[in-house]
A protein has these predicted regions:
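C-terminal cap/loop subdomain of S1 sulfatases and analogous C-terminal strand-loop tails that border
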Residues: 1-39, 43
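Helix-turn-helix-type domain boundary/helix-start signal
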Residues: 43, 51-54
Length: 226
């Protein structure tokens, strides 16, 4: 049995199950999971997994899928999957808030993993769509904010609002060479209270298309701030 997701285990997106002869795979990233696109391989006749024969063996597909979902239910029942609070503000060291540590809401916003240190929050394009990080702030104070993102030249111009129980910090989205080429943009400073808090990144004013591809947010406590 195998399932892989950088956020919450999902029985439909990236999974596989095998026995001594058969291997059934479901692999979906940005596309909607579709049982007609599951892949079945005969490991004895085709150890290289070159020929998908799911359509020829529907009974094996049903058997293996049931075995997988039974196992998935057993190992996930009673478990809570959510990001832990990120420690911020220790000895003035900068902290990077990665996309995979956030939760997100909105009709278009999406998390994409294209490689280590190459994951993004993307797809968002309407006012109110947001990503949220849980923080554990060691010291209250003002924190410098640096955004790491890409934005296609024709899509720039929207406004990202950062907030954490304080005066919001607005950043006008700037263009990069392409949406896949990230740059760092100082966004100003924000007040963070000590203890548990949330940092929200919200579309305040939408641009003409995809808002940005956010690759990370860097926070660094400013000297002598309280």
């Amino acid at each position: 049995y195998h399932t892989w997701d950088r956020y919450t285990p999902n029985p439909d997106k990236r999974w596989s199950v095998s026995d001594q002869r058969w291997k059934l795979i479901g692999l979906f990233s940005k596309t909607k999971p579709d049982p007609t696109k599951w892949q079945l391989y005969d490991l004895q006749a085709d150890p290289g997994e070159t020929k998908n024969i799911a359509g020829q063996h529907p009974a094996e597909v049903r058997r293996l899928r049931k075995a997988f979902t039974d196992w998935f239910s057993e190992v996930t029942t009673g478990q809570t999957y959510r990001p832990v609070p990120i420690p911020v503000g220790h000895d003035m060291r900068p902290v990077e808030l990665q996309p995979s540590w956030a939760t997100w809401t909105g009709p278009h916003i999406n998390y994409t993993f294209d490689g280590y240190d190459w994951d993004t929050i993307d797809g968002w394009k309407t006012r109110g769509e947001q990503a949220v990080w849980q923080l554990a702030v060691a010291q209250a104070g003002r924190y410098a904010v640096t955004l790491h993102y890409g934005c296609a030249p024709l899509q720039a111009g929207g406004t990202l609002r950062l907030s954490a129980k304080s005066q919001p910090l607005d950043h006008k989205v700037r263009a990069t060479v392409t949406a896949e080429q990230f740059s760092q943009f100082p966004a100003g400073a924000i007040n963070l209270p000590a203890g548990q808090t949330t940092l929200k990144a919200t579309i305040h004013h939408a641009g003409p298309g995809e808002f940005m591809r956010l690759n990370g947010i860097h926070l660094q406590r400013l000297p002598n701030s309280r």
